[in-house]
Structures are given as structure tokens and as C-alpha cells.
Amino acid sequence: MQAACWYVLFLLQPTVYLVTCANLTNGGKSELLKSGSSKSTLKHIWTESSKDLSISRLLSQTFRGKENDTDLDLRYDTPEPYSEQDLWDWLRNSTDLQEPRPRAKRRPIVKTGKFKKMFGWGDFHSNIKTVKLNLLITGKIVDHGNGTFSVYFRHNSTGQGNVSVSLVPPTKIVEFDLAQQTVIDAKDSKSFNCRIEYEKVDKATKNTLCNYDPSKTCYQEQTQSHVSWLCSKPFKVICIYISFYSTDYKLVQKVCPDYNYHSDTPYFPSG
């Protein structure tokens, strides 16, 4: 009698038969439904095991279909970097004291909207002129877009004097003591992750007209130096520290970029 009943249900409601068989196989706890549509029948006989199976299958299909979309959302094009020669050529054009030439058109470092640059304070320029020394320092920052950035400096001087250009934490004290200028406190080392990547100094001598008396000839020394720094996370703020010493002039200067310009979190100096 039970088999006949199942046979009638198969003819009248094949959907109910299939779901009910699955239910009996899993636990045998289902009962025959006396009335109601196939939609309400599915609602009542949907067991926990069937629910888990269907939901897991649905989730697997959903995530499997969106794997490529996630990769595409996270991927960005690699920025077009400057070559080393392009950077030094640009700095040479900027530091040419004899015949200033217009700055060549530069290629964009990154494609707009691909990722946020860490720094946006651009180029650095410092010009110092005294009776015995003419000094021009230019710098450029290049954001690589991968959590690191490089800072390039070039200095061109004519005359006698000592010049030092370096990167320091914002807590660095401005002082004339040469012995303490290169010391970085231990508490700053965690937020200052920069190192010298390249350094070169070229010197030459020549006789030119004296600045204080054009009728006389003076012995002058010409110096050109190149230095590049590579910085990476973690870091907070970096500052440019310039120390200049000559027989008639001394200067120590610390220049910090506008950190609020390139960061969502304002920087509040301390110490």
C-alpha cells in the first residue's frame, strides 16, 4: 500500500517525490503532506542537511565566479619609472649655473588614478651665494608606487666651502656641531627608513675673476656631487637637512615638506 501511494505521488507531484526521497535518505523524518502547493511543500521539507549542501554549493559558485573580478580590482599598471640617466640629466639642467636652459618636458611618473602617491611635495631647490662661494642644490623625489621612493640630490658649487645635504627625521635638531649632525636617535630609527643608494663627487679647479674685485684673478674650486636616497616603509616624515660652511659664511637649515598635503592624517611634530 505504501508503494502505491508513492507511485501516485510520483505521477501527480514529481517534484515532491524527489525532495521527499532525498529527505528520507538523509534522516527519514519527513512526513507526507496533506495539502498545499509545491512551493509550500519545498518550504517545509527543506532539511538542515539539504540547506547546508545547497548554500555551500551556492557560495562556491558565487566566489568561483568572482575570483577574476577581485584580481582585476586589485591590480594596477606598473608606473613608468624614470631611468637613472633621465634623473641625473634633469638635475644637471637645473643646476647649470653658467647657461641656464629650459627644463625638458618630463614624462609622467605614474598613471592618474591607479594608486595614491606617498609624497607630493615635488622638486627641491636651494640657492646660496656669498662672496667666496656660489652654491645651487636641486633635488627630486620619485615615488615608485610600491611602498618605496627615491630622493635625488645634485649640488653644484664654485668657490671654497663644505656642503652637506642629507635626509633626517623631523625631530632632528638644527645645530652647527658637525660631530652630531649624522646621529639619529634610536626612537627615530623606527620611523625613518632611508639609506644612501648612490653617491659621487667630482672636483675641478680653475682661475676666474674674483667676485669682490673683478680686476683680480682668484683661484676657485668647482664641485659637483650626486647622491640618491632610497626610503621605504615604515616612516612618518622626512626632512632635508643642509649644512654649509665657508670661511665667511655658515648655514644650517632643515626643510620639511608639507605633510598635510600628501597624507589624510595630519602630522603634528613633537620633541
Curated annotation (Swiss-Prot):
Residues 98-176 are annotated as: III. It holds the Pfam family Neurexophilin. Residues 177-185 are annotated as: IV (linker domain). Residues 22-97 are annotated as: II. It comes from the Eukaryota. Coiled coil: none annotated. The keyword Secreted applies. One of its GO terms (cellular component) is synaptic cleft. One of its GO terms (biological process) is modulation of chemical synaptic transmission. Glycans are attached at residues 23, 68, 93, 146, 156, 162. Keywords: Glycoprotein, Secreted, Signal. Residues 1-21 form the signal peptide. Belongs to the neurexophilin family. PANTHER family: NEUREXOPHILIN, NEUREXOPHILIN-1. May be signaling molecules that resemble neuropeptides and that act by binding to alpha-neurexins and possibly other receptors. This is Neurexophilin-1. It comes from Homo sapiens.
